[in-house]
Design a protein with these regions (language model features):
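Surface-exposed charge patches
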Residues: 38, 65, 69, 119
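Short small-residue beta-strand/loop micro-motif enriched in glycine and branched aliphatics
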Residues: 18-22, 76-77
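Active-site beta-loop-alpha junctions of metal-dependent nucleic acid enzymes
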Residues: 21-45
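C-terminal domain-tail junction helix/linker
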Residues: 70-72, 94-175
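Short catalytic-loop micro-motif centered on adjacent basic/acidic residues
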Residues: 22, 48-53
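Short, glycine/acidic-enriched loop or turn micro-motifs at the edges of active sites
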Residues: 16, 56
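Mobile-element integrase/transposase regions
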Residues: 1-12, 18, 31-34, 160-175
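RNase H-like two-metal-ion nuclease catalytic core shared by retroviral integrases
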Residues: 52-54, 60-68, 74-97, 108-115, ...
Length: 175
């Protein structure tokens, strides 16, 4: 939560650190679906897996149905374990330190400014652990990146299951 009525959704590719960010007025399944579509559209490779916290906006049936339909594995982290989502947590900190300190959250242009900053982050900003930009890393890995058909061949819908916010129910359904 950035401010009242202002929430940031963040996706980070585990390997390249490519970043997709968007701002919404609330955390809902509908906004999550919109964000997933945005991520799939903006990432230059097929998405194989979504890892999230256990927020209701991510565990909603509509969200899980879309991921299953698109052949994307859904992997929520354990409750109260934000360290398991470390790359996203770090990316959010970077956005706070490098973007939000420079802008007015009430600006009518906030969404456009965030998109411009995302472009800067992915194409121009050298990432500390990679010593290159996320897009440079992506181009470096492109020859060995699986295409959509290859990723779909690895997806086994029968091995996927529904996740619930209730850990006991999840444990029961896992058996």
């Amino acid at each position: 939560k950035l401010a009242p009525g202002l929430y940031q959704y963040t996706a980070v590719d585990d390997c390249t650190r490519l970043l997709v960010v968007a701002i919404y007025q609330c955390r809902t399944a509908a906004n999550t679906l919109d964000f997933i579509e945005r991520v799939v559209e903006q990432m230059p490779f097929p998405i194989q897996r979504f890892q999230t916290d256990n927020g209701r906006e991510f565990t909603a049936q509509k969200v899980q149905d879309l991921l299953l339909e698109w052949g994307i594995k859904f992997r929520p982290i354990r409750p109260a374990a934000p360290h398991l989502n470390g790359k996203v947590e770090r990316a959010q900190k970077t956005v706070m330190e490098e973007f939000y300190v420079l802008v007015d959250l009430a600006s009518a242009d906030l969404h456009d400014e965030l998109e411009q900053w995302q472009f800067y982050y992915n194409w121009q900003r050298v990432h500390g652990s990679l010593n290159k930009t996320p897009m440079e890393r992506c181009c470096e890995l492109f020859p060995i990146t699986p295409f959509s058909e290859e990723g779909q061949a690895l997806f086994d819908e029968d091995r996927e299951r529904e996740f619930h916010r209730d850990r006991l129910l999840n444990r029961y359904l896992k058996k």
